């Protein structure tokens, strides 16, 4: 080893000339043994005010400022080991030991700021020399390298980011949207075709899909497993972008996030800003997928078994995971991912442990998210590089109450037959959602690898046969559903999943498996569904009507045999926008009305960028009879009160005429009738009218009930709402 020597004269050594006793420091803030807390938040004092709502939201939560930690546990030095000493003190001395610790601040590898570029808020611990990685586990590993507290981090850089995240988290936990999305796990697998090139590397490409299938085996029947495997999607080569992309896979991912999913798990290649070489998700100068992720506050927990996607300790670059968790009121509730590279085997082993810990046989864990992750950490480096971005005290979105005594009658169903789900409820009364799903089928996909065709086989989820809602009382429920003519005749049985809630806080979920389907008698029905269009306010719409862009269009589809939702080729539920050329399959958006097996709706989001809307809807009933309907609407962008298409009909009239008009918003309407000379002869009493088309009748009589003489008259219609007023003057004629 090389050695370094220093030489100096003894006279160069300085000696203190005076020592003055200043007294002893009383450590009374954090070294108070009477402290009690379940949850600790660690961050700078500047973040304290922003953290107060979370402190109040959580039970027994203490905010420990970094300044106090450094002062009491590392002699004032900004040393991450001071954080560990503090946390160890809480475990050994506090009256109540905290279980979780939330690190409120970003970090990088340079806590001593040797580079001069460090912007650390709350430091992490860097492990290793040649191969290094960041881990927060070591901050709570007091007797070795296994963490003894559940740890999570929000990589905040500013007080505003803290406020935004805490607002999102509290809103999510206190106003979590109900629905079947809480029973959904979305498994995403990278394409097996690239970037591996050598024949011996083929197993790596295959492993993404194979290990996702392995993970699916850890997930119970009462959960809905959506599979988004990139091998299913077509390749696109565009000269404007380098390499092969799969834009349909990206759009399918966005659609799934919009519909809602409790967990989204990715297995495949990645880097700090990208999933898959085909750019399934990416942040770059040319493309920012983060801005396209819309969850409608059905915030998923993201689990990414890939390389470096959560590399938060890089001084020069922010990772996708950091930006995603910071997204205000959208994006993610929490993220579990790696900050360095990981092997195929270590990856699937850790992911399996996560799901095995959440789903324990016939029960769902009651642990918070941080404790779930802590409980599967063993001190190995593969586990240490998996980080939790988010509050470790956050509860899982899956309802904890399971209903296991449900049954379907009859247990073998024929096509076009009606089945009934019968179950007892832990909730006295409320509403629920039922989904009837065909059995999965084995499929084989081909892909090109090293100029050779390869194949991969997996189980494809069965199509949805029914998706409806119901209400119940007296702690029992018995919703019905119909079997369509289109079934896959899979060798695997069908299943029913359901969720119920009381409209407040109580929820329960369950499923019934082993439902067998067979071919039934043919139907005499030859009529297709009836398709109508409505505004959100319930107004029936027809061609040429007005719809404000701040309202959704309701598409109602009805048929005595029910609506075909299987998605079988040629029998899809399509919405075609003839102005944009876009066609979407609306099967996932269709939901039956409460307690109905005949009628349901699709909520169509209207773009505020368009002036007109032209849609063609095609639908099939369960007996495979088709219908097509078309509508053209004028889209109103302004929120200003206006009256359009005002006329009276018939005109001239003898006994009665109708004043018709369209309103751009609800308003109070009055109509006055005048002679040509301006004398008022009739006032029609003010009445409230709804947005859209309206009509008011008049019998041609004056205020005293007398018939008015033949001739020309003027009418004045006034619309008023709040401080907005509008008038219209027109002519009418009476002729008898």
What spans do the regions from the language model cover?
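C-terminal tail/sorting-segment detector
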Residues: 632, 706-736
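A structural signal for beta-strand boundary/capping segments at domain termini and interdomain linkers
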Residues: 564, 624-628, 680, 705-707, ...
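Long, low-complexity serine/threonine/glycine- and acidic-rich segments characteristic of extracellular
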Residues: 435-517, 535-539, 544, 548, ...
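Cysteine-dependent hydrolase recognition
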Residues: 1-469, 473-482, 487-492, 497-519, ...
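Short, compositionally biased P/S/T/A/G/V-rich stretches that sit at domain boundaries
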Residues: 388-422, 518-551, 558, 636-652
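Short edge beta-strand/loop segments characteristic of extracellular beta-sandwich folds
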Residues: 420-426, 552-560, 658-664
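Short, conserved beta-strand segments of beta-strand-rich sandwich/propeller modules, principally
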Residues: 493-497, 612-616, 658, 695, ...
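Glycine-centered coil/turn sites that cap beta-strands in beta-rich domains
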Residues: 632-649, 653-675, 683-687, 695-698, ...
């Amino acid at each position: 080893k090389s050695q370094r020597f220093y030489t100096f004269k003894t006279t160069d050594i300085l000696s203190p000339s005076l020592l003055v006793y200043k007294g002893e420091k009383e450590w009374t803030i954090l070294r108070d043994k009477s402290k009690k807390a379940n949850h600790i938040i660690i961050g700078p004092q500047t973040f304290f005010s922003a953290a107060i709502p979370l402190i109040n939201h959580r039970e027994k939560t203490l905010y420990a400022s970094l300044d106090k930690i450094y002062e009491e546990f590392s002699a004032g030095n900004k040393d991450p080991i001071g954080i560990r000493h503090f946390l160890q003190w809480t475990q050994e001395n506090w009256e109540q030991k905290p279980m979780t610790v939330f690190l409120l601040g970003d970090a990088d590898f340079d806590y001593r700021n040797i580079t001069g570029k460090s912007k650390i808020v709350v430091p992490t611990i860097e492990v290793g020399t040649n191969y290094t990685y960041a881990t927060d586990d070591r901050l709570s590993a007091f007797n070795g390298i296994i963490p003894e507290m559940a740890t999570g981090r929000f990589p905040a850089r500013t007080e505003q980011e803290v406020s935004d995240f805490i607002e999102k988290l509290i809103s999510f936990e206190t106003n979590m949207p109900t629905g079947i999305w809480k029973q959904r796990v979305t498994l995403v697998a990278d394409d097996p075709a690239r970037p591996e090139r050598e024949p011996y590397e083929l197993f790596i490409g295959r492993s993404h899909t194979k290990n996702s299938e392995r993970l699916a085996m850890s997930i119970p029947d009462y959960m809905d497993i959506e599979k988004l495997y990139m091998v299913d999607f077509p390749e696109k080569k565009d000269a404007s972008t380098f390499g092969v992309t799969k834009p349909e896979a990206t759009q399918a991912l966005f659609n799934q996030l919009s519909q809602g999913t409790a967990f989204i798990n990715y297995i495949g290649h990645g880097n700090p800003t990208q999933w898959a070489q085909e750019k399934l998700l990416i942040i770059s100068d040319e493309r920012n997928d983060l801005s396209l992720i819309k969850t409608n506050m059905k915030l998923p927990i993201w689990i990414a078994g890939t390389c470096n996607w959560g590399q938060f300790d890089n001084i020069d670059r922010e990772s996708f995971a950091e930006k995603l968790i910071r997204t205000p009121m959208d994006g993610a509730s929490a993220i579990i991912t790696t900050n360095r590279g990981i092997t195929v085997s270590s990856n699937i082993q850790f992911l399996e442990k996560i799901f095995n810990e959440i789903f324990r046989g016939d029960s769902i864990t009651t642990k918070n998210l941080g404790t779930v992750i802590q409980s599967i950490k063993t001190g190995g480096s593969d586990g240490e590089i998996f980080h939790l971005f988010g509050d470790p005290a956050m509860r899982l979105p899956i309802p904890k109450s399971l209903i296991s005594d449900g049954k379907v009658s009859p247990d073998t169903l024929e096509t076009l037959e009606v089945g009934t789900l019968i179950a007892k409820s832990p909730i006295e009364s409320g509403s629920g959602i039922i989904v009837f799903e065909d059995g999965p089928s084995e499929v084989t996909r081909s892909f090109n690898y090293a100029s050779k065709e390869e194949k991969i086989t997996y189980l494809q989820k069965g199509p949805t046969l029914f998706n409806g809602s119901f209400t119940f009382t007296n702690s029992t429920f018995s919703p019905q559903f119909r079997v369509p003519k289109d079934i896959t005749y899979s060798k695997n049985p069908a299943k029913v999943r359901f969720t119920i809630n009381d409209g407040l806080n109580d929820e329960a979920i369950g499923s019934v498996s082993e439902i067998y389907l067979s071919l039934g008698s043919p139907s005499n029905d030859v009529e297709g569904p009836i398709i109508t269009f409505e505004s959100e306010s319930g107004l029936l719409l027809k061609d040429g009507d007005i719809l404000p862009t701040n309202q959704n269009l309701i598409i109602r589809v009805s048929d005595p045999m029910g609506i075909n939702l299987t998605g079988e080729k040629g029998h899809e539920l399509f919405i075609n926008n003839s102005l944009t050329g876009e066609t979407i399959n609306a099967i996932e958006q269709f939901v039956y009305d409460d307690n109905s097996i005949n009628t349901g709706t699709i909520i169509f989001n209207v773009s505020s960028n368009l002036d007109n809307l032209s849609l063609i809807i095609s639908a099939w009933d369960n007996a495979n009879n088709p219908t097509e309907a078309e509508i053209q609407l004028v889209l109103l962008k302004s929120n200003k009160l206006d009256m359009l298409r005002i006329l009276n009909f018939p005109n001239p009239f003898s006994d009665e005429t109708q004043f018709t008009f369209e309103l751009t918003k609800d308003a109070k309407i009055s109509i006055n009738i005048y002679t040509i000379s301006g004398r008022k002869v009739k006032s029609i009493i003010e009445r409230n009218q709804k947005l859209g088309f309206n009509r008011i009748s008049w019998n041609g009589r004056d205020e005293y009930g007398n018939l008015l003489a033949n001739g020309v008259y003027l009418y004045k219609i006034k619309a008023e709402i709040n401080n907005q007023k509008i008038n219209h003057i027109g002519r009418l004629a009476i002729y008898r």
